[in-house]
Amino acid sequence: MQRCLIYEKSMAGETKNGGASASGWKEHSRTKLLVGVDLFCLFLAGLPFLVIETSAVQPYRRGFYCHDESIKYPAKNGDTISDGVLSAAGILITILSIVIGESYRIYFLNEGSKSFVGNPYISALYKQVGVFVFGCAISQSFTDIAKVSVGRLRPHFLDVCKPDFTTINCSLGYIADYQCQGPESRVQEARKSFFSGHASFSMYTMLYLVFYLQSRFTWHGARLLRPLTQFTLVMMSFYTGLSRVSDHKHHPTDVLAGFLQGALVAYCIAFFVSDLFKAKGRRCALSSTPVKKELVPPADIRERSNHLIMA
């Protein structure tokens, strides 16, 4: 009889451990599935950008007017703000701010969020950085789709294209049949003026960081520190867009459209995709004052009961 009890206890322990192991395996599989779905969505969001940047899709071939002064600017060598500086500043500044902000919230304020990732630091960074990168992919895909679909000529197009005007009859007005003598890669790039990628990317990254600071920067010691930081970020984006006009890379309307697109994507990502401004449930504070209970004598209880019965 004793051996049977020992056998039953051992079998119960093995069954319990086996159930816990199976549950852990299912949770691990679910985590990998959710991460895979997120990565797949991120890939789809950035797919148009990846395809267009590899020159798999050529921009629309637009004609021009011989006397169009807006595309006769000289081509400048280099950019005031290069693509590398723009990408590094926009991505690194925002991600570094998110890492510092989320780590501070978890370590000092004990504020976390529920997620399928167990570690609170990894969970917070996975959500916030992932949402930000997803918005980057959306913004850049929108920008490149507009560039190749519209095919607007940059202000320095004629200087880069170098068409042979001896074979062009300018009296016809709009010239659609022409051949460029400049380098093909530069000519194709000169057809991507609308809208400004520098303006849209800088506005998205800086404005998203502005929204992040508005949600997470809760220190009230210096009332003007947060708005000063936010306006500085917006001014950095503003200067980046204006530099594209002075570099003869974009028309002013291209920059304005880029600003609007970047701001719209940043707003949608911050308010509808991330949890930065979602309402959080408040815990009810427990009252420290003890509740006073009225002690009723048994005679009064019987009298009240009889009164209820008669009623």
Spans of features found by a protein language model:
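N-terminal transmembrane-helix/juxtamembrane module of multi-pass inner/ER membrane proteins
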Residues: 1-131, 141-158, 173, 177-189, ...
